[in-house]
Amino acid sequence: MRDFYLFLGAVFLLVLGVWAYNAYKEHKINSFKEISYKVYLFEKGKLKKEEILKITKGTPFYPYVLAKFGNFQEIYEDIEEENMKKFYKERLSADFYLNKKYGKALENLKEIKKEDFNYPSAKSLEAFSYEKLGKINKALSLWSAIKEEYPNTYFGNLSQVKIFLLKEKER
C-alpha cells in the first residue's frame, strides 16, 4: 500500500510540474501579446517614447523599438546574440554613412570578419565609404575583391556595375 501512495504522489508531482510549466509558458505568451499590443499603440501614436522604452526594456521588442528611434549603438550594446550583434554593427555603420561620417563607418566595419554572414554587404559599405572619401583606388580594389569572391551574386553584380561606373568617371 505504501508503494501505491508513493507512486500516486510521484504522478501527482509530475502532473503538477507539467501544469506549472504550461501555466508559465501561457503567462509568458500573454505578456508578450500585451507588449506587442503596446508596440502597436506606440506605432499608432498613442504611447510616448519614454513609455514604450520602459515597457519593452528587457524584452525581444526592445531592439525593434530602439531601431524605430535610430538608436543603433544602444541596440548593438544591448544585444547578446553574435549574428544579430554583427547585423546591428553593420546597421550602425550604415547610419554613420548616411550621416556623412564615413571615417566612423569604416572604423566600425573593421570588426566584421570574412566568416561573418554579412561580410559582403559590409565590404560594399566600406567601398562606398572610401568612394565618398575620394579614395577611388581603395574603393576599386574592394569592389574587385567582392566581384572575385562573390561572382553571380547580388554583391558580385553590384561590384561589376560600380567598377564600370568608377572607371568611366576617371576618363
From Swiss-Prot:
Keywords linked to the UniProt accession: Signal
InterPro entries found in the cross-reference section: TPR-like_helical_dom_sf
Signal peptide residue numbers: 1-20
Name of the featured protein: Uncharacterized protein aq_711
